[in-house]
């Protein structure tokens, strides 16, 4: 009898349609709400993306998953509420939770202890704790979207089960050691990361959107041209990167697409017609590694009163030192064109933050200039070592793209492409702490081009879901935000020929940063926007609880 291995994951949800992703143990037919889809096969693994259509806007519809006619979801005697599809309605209120960086570990000691208590500790899982609270609250208080902003899995810090699986297949005494080596090992990592019953339930009933960052492939992936040249000399790298792209396409990317976009996707269209998926997905992965323009991973969604544009800020980097870009020109055209329109809020999501603490921004500016030869060849080699050692690879380290994104936000916020939205908010993860910056533009005030008040502009960062920093790492981070460090870094950047940015930013109300496992919630209702950040705390002889760290009205 066919079995459900992983899922269901509720992925795309619009006003009248939804997609639901599953993995099964063999070729079969999957049925959800009378929609039937045959599985496709990739290297011995079987998947289906079921398209459910004909739903009504603004409704909640319970569903079951049938595999070859047998009900496999919900599990028998499940203690959790029923899985539902909650469709959106244009202009209606919308609740987004977002975060990044979640390692898969058991929810018990020593893994849920404080980082400084045990070297194996990852503290309490924020997503697990959020899901636990959801089960006790009415559906109208549930989020509409879970936005994953990178490092959904850690290919170089694998789960206990994945490490045992790898050790049963090959020696971990030689590279890549206990890290993932190929597609087969990635499938086990995703299984361990998403199969906890409570995590499985929240993923079945809250729509999700995802974009990868470095740890989905490897720490520091695509940091620089020199990093790529060095890693490609490793004999194990080809299968690692191909397996990473293959698994990302199957487990994450497909569900980001709307039904219409699936119809336009040449690979998925051939798979849906019955062609063998494995060779096609592998060929796509190999092209994606060698050609940044081979695949557009960025995507967009309309969320109630908002437009969400999720930008790939990892795979599509142009790394030539003389023409570095965070995304290539074609992908940037897509981002620009989908950031314009008639909506109350523009949400621009990027795994790595657009705005860092000012001192770190100046340091990355300095580093990019010196790596490109501003101080000569020897200094360039030293700067490259520094870049890789302390991860100087955010938008500030791609100055051309930084200025393009700043100009895009300014033009949208000031109403140059129509009426200005109420907010323009950049959502990010990656840096293992949380903060909210408010942004001001040097060239204009609060008035927009058409006389209306300009949109409020913010950078909101929330990280990690589960991979908190140690106390020593936190002190280093705080030093990078100090006034002496900022002054020194700015002087270095200017000495290397970098220009000050055209925007200014500061912490909202002077609060933050917060160093915890945490999740952020963004609530949109018409032209109002409210944000809060919560962290999980161990329960007193009971389950973990969420504690509010900050709440702020953004518009």
Regions found by a protein language model. Give the residues of each.
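Metal-dependent phosphoester/phosphodiester hydrolase catalytic core
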Residues: 1-555
């Amino acid at each position: 009898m066919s079995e459900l291995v992983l899922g269901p994951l509720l992925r795309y949800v619009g006003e009248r349609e939804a997609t639901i992703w599953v993995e099964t143990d063999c070729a079969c037919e999957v049925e959800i709400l009378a929609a039937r889809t045959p599985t496709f096969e990739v290297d011995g693994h079987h998947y289906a993306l079921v398209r459910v259509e004909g739903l009504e806007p603004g409704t909640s519809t319970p569903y079951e998953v049938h595999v070859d006619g047998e009900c496999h979801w919900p599990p028998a005697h499940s203690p959790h509420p029923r899985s539902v599809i909650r469709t959106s309605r244009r202009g209606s209120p919308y609740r987004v939770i977002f975060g990044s960086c979640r390692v898969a570990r058991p929810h018990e000691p020593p893994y849920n202890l404080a980082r400084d208590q045990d070297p194996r500790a990852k503290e309490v899982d924020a997503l697990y704790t959020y899901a636990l609270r959801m089960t006790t609250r009415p559906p109208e208080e549930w989020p509409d979207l879970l936005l994953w902003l990178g490092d959904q899995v850690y290919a170089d810090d694998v789960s206990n089960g994945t490490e045992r699986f790898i050790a049963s297949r090959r020696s971990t005494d030689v590279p890549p050691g206990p890290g993932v080596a190929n597609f087969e090992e990635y499938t086990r990592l995703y299984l361990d990361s998403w199969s906890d019953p409570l995590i499985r339930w929240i993923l079945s009933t809250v729509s999700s959107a995802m974009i990868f960052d470095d740890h989905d492939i490897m720490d520091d992936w695509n940091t620089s041209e020199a990093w790529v040249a060095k890693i490609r000399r490793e004999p194990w790298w080809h299968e690692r990167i191909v397996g990473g792209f293959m698994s990302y396409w199957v487990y994450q990317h497909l569900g980001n697409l709307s039904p219409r976009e699936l119809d336009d996707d040449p690979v998925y269209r051939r798979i849906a017609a019955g062609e063998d998926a494995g060779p096609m997905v592998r060929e796509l992965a190999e092209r994606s590694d060698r050609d940044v323009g081979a695949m557009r991973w960025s995507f967009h969604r309309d969320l109630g009163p908002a437009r969400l544009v999720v930008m790939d800020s990892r795979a599509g980097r142009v790394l030539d030192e003389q023409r570095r870009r965070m995304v290539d020109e074609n992908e940037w055209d897509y981002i620009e064109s989908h950031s314009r329109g008639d909506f109350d809020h523009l949400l621009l999501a990027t795994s790595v933050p657009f705005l860092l603490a000012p001192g770190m921004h100046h340091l990355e500016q300095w580093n990019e200039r010196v790596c490109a030869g501003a101080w000569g060849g020897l200094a360039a080699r030293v700067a490259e070592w520094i870049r890789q050692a302390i991860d100087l690879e955010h938008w500030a380290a791609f100055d051309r793209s930084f200025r393009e994104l700043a100009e895009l936000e300014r033009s949208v916020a000031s109403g140059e492409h129509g009426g200005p939205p109420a907010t323009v908010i950049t959502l990010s993860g990656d840096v293992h702490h949380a903060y909210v910056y408010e942004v001001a533009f040097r060239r204009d005030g609060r008035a927009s081009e058409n006389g209306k008040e300009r949109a409020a502009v913010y950078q909101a960062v929330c990280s990690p879901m589960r991979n908190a920093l140690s106390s020593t790492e936190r002190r280093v981070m705080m030093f990078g935000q100090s006034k002496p460090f900022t002054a020194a870094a700015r002087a270095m950047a200017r000495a290397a020929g970098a220009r000050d940015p055209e925007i200014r930013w500061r912490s909202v109300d002077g609060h933050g940063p917060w160093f915890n496992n945490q999740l952020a919630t963004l609530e949109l209702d018409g032209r109002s926007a409210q944000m809060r950040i919560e962290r999980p705390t161990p329960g007193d002889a009971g389950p973990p609880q969420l504690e509010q760290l900050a709440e702020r009205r953004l518009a």
